[in-house]
């Protein structure tokens, strides 16, 4: 067996290598070593004399330096490949998905994944379906549109209201998700997603514009199995409805002017309402009759939005409030937020004390959404921005999204989370079975890092989807 047969070189390549080595040894005046190698390789001097050896001088050194340069280039390419791979992973959906397996610090960033166009007039509200990748948007063009937010496609348009649709919300009895809408035509409509969004019921009773509607979570004493719906109207009242019968079961009075917005607590026992009287009211609906427990004053103009803080935010808000103890997680109405035409956001405790004023918006604050992990509060406003406030840093504004909205931003929603048992998590609270999607957060809840906004761009309304 020859040396060539034991290598990866062809016979021709091996012969050239041997001649280069002999020429190299000869150039170093190592004649004895060169002659010994000649004999071993059976290269007699008459077939490889000094004249031919001269042709191979320097060839071995050139080959060696070429190998070194090639090796360095390979190392450089490997480093560049690793860098590019890291950039792709940091920017691509797969990497973002990996990062958001712990989504506590995820915040919406531009550009949006989708900008959904189709409404002819401003958008007033958006709402996520608790199970599927469907999103409802309400508009002043009298319609509701259903979108697939994962694909960025329009699924259908719902017509039935005769004036501007002002709010939408998904919820309802266990296993029977419904869509509720309310309008300037003074009516509330219920739509069945399982039956091609058929309008199954229209609720009448308010004497003026109905501006806000929300399903009351099923796990409270007043929840009635997820059958309750609450509405707010320019007739200065809130109403509780049984969606299975369509009857108004309670009328709640107390506001001195239009209660523009209403939100239920996660346990279904409490309601938070706010509006044109510049006050926010905390209602206990767990008893036989609703009772106003706290009235919160402080805003200097009409209030436009309100939200209960999730229990995950209690550690941050308790510190802001100067409380020595963090409230228990099963207490659902410890802290609240309101947004106003005075350009401010106010954070409140359940005693009605304002614990923090968040300032930074340059126009009316239209919508609020707490981060499910509790660390951040998201707000949108007529200054064409979305702001992110870090509650762990005394409410510091840590991010402002601007330049991507062409007009007033009227609403914002965070997609509801999903618990390990497949039921609605977070603030969705409608008891509807849900499939597991998104990253898993603490407490056995899978958090979906998806945020939707509605705005007016020119005269048209646009929905924007921000997702990991």
UniProtKB/Swiss-Prot annotation:
State whether it acts alone or in a complex, and with which partners, per the record.
Self-associates. Interacts with NDL1 and dynein.
Q: Point out the signal peptide segment.
A: none
Q: Where are the WD repeats?
A: 118-159, 161-201, 205-251, 254-293, 298-358, 360-399, 404-429, 430-468
- Protein name (database record): Nuclear distribution protein PAC1-2
Keywords linked to the UniProt accession: Cell cycle, Cell division, Coiled coil, Cytoplasm, Cytoskeleton, Microtubule, Mitosis, Repeat, Transport, WD repeat
Q: What is the lineage of its organism?
A: Eukaryota, Fungi, Dikarya, Ascomycota, Pezizomycotina
Single GO BP term: microtubule sliding
| Domain (LisH): residue spans on this chain | 13-45
A molecular function (GO) term: dynein complex binding
As for family, the record states:
Belongs to the WD repeat LIS1/nudF family.
Q: From what organism does this protein derive?
A: Podospora anserina (strain S / ATCC MYA-4624 / DSM 980 / FGSC 10383) (Pleurage anserina)
Q: What is its main location?
A: cytoplasm
Coiled-coil residue windows: 66-92
> Per the entry's comment, what about the domains?
Dimerization mediated by the LisH domain may be required to activate dynein.
Where found in the cell? Cytoplasm, Cytoskeleton; Cytoplasm, Cytoskeleton, Spindle pole
